[in-house]
Amino acid sequence: MINKLLISILVSVFLISNSFAAGSGDSGSSKSKTKYDMAVTHIKTAKNFEKKNKPKKARKRYEKAQKLLIQSNKKFPNKAETLNYLGFTTRKLGDFENGEKYYLQGLAINPYHIGINEYLGELYVATNRHNLAVERLEVLKGCDCKEYNDLKAIIAGEKISKY
């Protein structure tokens, strides 16, 4: 009888201590954000600052995003999405030449990337190279997407690029 009671107490103590241990601390199962993910968050925030007419705050976010994207691109090279955002942030910071280089690197990986083709087309319009913008539009022609219509309107002068 005493043995059964002692065993019951020991089992209870063991179960209670394990339940407390299971609830304490971080199990490591939560996924931490990558530099790419953090950069995308900064870009979204920067776009919101632009909508609120806060260009200095937007620029700071684009700068932070660009630094994170450069790090991400070094660690995981040849990702079209990373190169798209690198082109975008670089262009937003006024460096059209290097922005174009990032876009072209991305197109070398995925020539039909919708975002890169649209943004590169917008860059070409902004730098008065309409013939090259039309080439990007032709790539988007069959996509049945908003990006095609936006770029078409920008090339036609019916819409001003928001980027």
Predicted features, each with a name:
Residues 75, 109, 140-143:
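Structural marker of alpha-solenoid helical repeat scaffolds
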Residues 24-33, 134-163:
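Terminal, low-structured helical/coil segments at or just beyond the last alpha-helical repeat
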Residues 79, 113, 145-148:
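Residue-level recognition of tetratricopeptide repeat
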